[in-house]
């Protein structure tokens, strides 16, 4: 049975995760003739409300990668407030042109523990939140074409009746957060570096 509704669920401090998740979710909704709804959990108030996606729906759930993992700020919300109720999920992570490390696996595990069946997963490059130079202009047109192909492939899988869970890459158990290092291999404390967040 095809999903009757596609949810775009995202945390997007700089807009690139929103752009990616909504593009994939809209493409799926259009391709499957399903309803579409967005849930933005970027601002703290949105993370005070539980989100339950009903059986028969599919949620494209996205977040950025921070230090190779799901941001620790989001863990309590994703662990305790997002529930699948038997719904399908597609975890999506954005990374700032270095690597997504274990973030996709971690998000997939969180969603599975919350009652979702993860039928795919995707990692896409986005402009880095701390630097407009790293991954500048990403996602770009070529990235969007990959997103469309990804969504089309998933729609074809669903049309074929395949809703089997998949295992995505990463290290299990999940590794510690990545520690940046200088050119001599010494750890660098980047806690003073703060991203600019678009609050509009």
What is the meaning of each model-derived region?
Residues 197-200:
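Iron-sulfur cluster-binding cysteine motifs and their immediate structural context
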Residues 1-19, 23-43, 49-192:
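FMN-binding flavodoxin-like domain, especially the glycine-rich phosphate-binding loop
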């Amino acid at each position: 049975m095809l999903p009757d509704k596609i949810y775009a669920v995202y945390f997007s401090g700089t807009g690139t995760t929103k752009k990616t998740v909504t593009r994939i979710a809209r493409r799926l909704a259009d391709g499957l003739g399903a309803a579409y709804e967005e849930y933005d959990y970027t601002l703290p108030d949105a993370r005070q409300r539980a989100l339950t996606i009903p059986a028969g729906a599919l949620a494209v759930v996205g977040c950025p990668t921070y230090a190779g993992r799901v941001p620790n700020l989001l863990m309590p919300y994703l662990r305790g407030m997002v529930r699948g109720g038997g719904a399908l999920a597609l975890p999506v992570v954005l990374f700032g042109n270095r690597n997504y490390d274990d973030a996709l696996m971690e998000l997939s595990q969180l969603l599975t523990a919350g009652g979702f069946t993860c039928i795919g997963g995707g990692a896409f490059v986005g402009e880095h939140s701390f630097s407009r130079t790293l991954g500048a202009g990403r996602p770009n047109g070529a990235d969007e074409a990959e997103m469309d192909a990804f969504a089309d492939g998933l729609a074809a899988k669903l049309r074929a009746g395949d809703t089997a869970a998949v295992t995505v890459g990463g290290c299990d158990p999940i590794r510690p957060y990545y520690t940046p290092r200088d050119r001599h291999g010494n750890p660098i404390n980047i806690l003073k570096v703060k991203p600019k967040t678009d609050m509009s």
